[in-house]
C-alpha cells in the first residue's frame, strides 16, 4: 500500500531526513520536489506563527496537507537571542560551524557551563487545505551552550554547540537514533502524530 504523502515546507535536506526517520509511515516530500514554489517570508513574531505561516502557504499551493517547522535556539544570557532569528541573524554566513562560532563569541565572557543555559525549540504546524484543519504545537529541550564547536558528520544547525540537559555531549556527538529520541523536533512530531491518528 502506498504511503500517504505529506509535504514539508523546507529545502533543508537534513530536516527532511529527520522527518523521514521519525514519520516512517508517511512519504515525506519537500520544497526540493517543487522547485517552482516560492517560499514565503518568515515575518511573524513567534515560532508557532512562522510554522503555521509556512504550512498554510504550501498547503494552499499544493491543495493538500503540508507541515511547517520553525526551529531555533534561545540563549538565556542573551535574553533568548537568537530565537526566531536563529536561521538568519548571522547572514551572510551560511556555514553551520561559522554561525555557531559567531554565537560562541557572544558568550566568551561566561566560563561556567551552568551559566550558559539555553533551550532548543521546535514549533510544528500542519495545515489541511482541503478540510481547512490545522494543528500547531511547540516543544522545547533545555540545556547548555558548549564552549567549542563539536564538528561532526552528524547534526546540523546548532547541534554542534547545544548540550541537552541530562547529557554530557552535544547533539552532534550523538548518533541520529539518540538525538531523534530526545530532540524538541521529536517531541513536537510525536504530538503531531497523535493529532493525525485522531483525525483519520
UniProtKB/Swiss-Prot annotation:
It comes from Mycoplasma mycoides subsp. mycoides SC (strain CCUG 32753 / NCTC 10114 / PG1). GO terms for cellular component: cytosol. Substrate binds at residues 10-15, 71, 156-159, 179. Gene3D superfamilies: 3.90.950.10. Belongs to the HAM1 NTPase family. PANTHER family: INOSINE TRIPHOSPHATE PYROPHOSPHATASE, INOSINE TRIPHOSPHATE PYROPHOSPHATASE/HAM1 PROTEIN. GO terms for molecular function: dITP diphosphatase activity; ITP diphosphatase activity; metal ion binding; nucleotide binding; ribonucleoside triphosphate phosphatase activity; XTP diphosphatase activity. The keyword Metal-binding applies. Its cofactor is Mg(2+). This is dITP/XTP pyrophosphatase. It catalyses: XTP + H2O = XMP + diphosphate + H(+); dITP + H2O = dIMP + diphosphate + H(+); ITP + H2O = IMP + diphosphate + H(+). SUPFAM superfamilies: ITPase-like (SSF52972). GO terms for biological process: nucleotide metabolic process; purine nucleoside triphosphate catabolic process.
Amino acid at each position: 500500500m502506498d504511503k500517504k504523502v505529506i509535504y514539508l515546507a523546507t529545502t533543508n535536506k537534513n530536516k527532511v531526513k529527520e522527518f523521514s526517520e521519525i514519520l516512517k509511515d508517511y512519504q515525506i516530500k519537500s520544497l526540493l520536489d517543487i522547485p517552482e514554489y516560492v517560499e514565503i517570508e518568515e515575518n511573524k513574531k513567534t515560532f508557532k506563527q512562522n510554522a503555521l505561516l509556512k504550512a498554510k502557504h504550501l498547503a494552499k499551493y499544493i491543495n493538500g496537507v503540508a507541515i511547517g517547522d520553525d526551529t531555533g535556539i534561545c540563549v538565556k544570557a542573551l535574553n533568548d537571542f537568537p530565537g526566531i532569528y536563529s536561521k538568519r541573524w548571522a547572514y551572510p554566513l551560511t556555514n553551520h560551524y561559522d554561525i555557531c562560532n559567531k554565537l560562541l563569541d557572544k558568550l566568551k565572557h561566561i566560563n561556567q557551563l551552568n551559566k550558559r543555559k539555553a533551550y532548543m525549540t521546535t514549533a510544528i504546524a500542519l495545515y489541511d487545505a482541503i478540510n481547512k484543519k490545522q494543528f500547531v504545537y511547540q516543544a522545547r529541550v533545555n540545556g547548555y551552550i558548549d564552549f567549542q564547536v563539536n564538528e561532526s558528520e552528524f547534526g546540523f544547525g546548532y547541534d554542534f554547540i547545544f548540550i541537552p540537559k541530562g547529557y554530557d555531549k552535544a547533539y552532534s556527538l550523538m548518533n541520529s537514533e539518540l538525538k531523534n529520541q530526545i530532540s524538541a523536533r521529536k517531541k513536537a512530531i510525536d504530538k503531531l502524530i497523535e493529532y493525525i491518528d485522531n483525525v483519520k
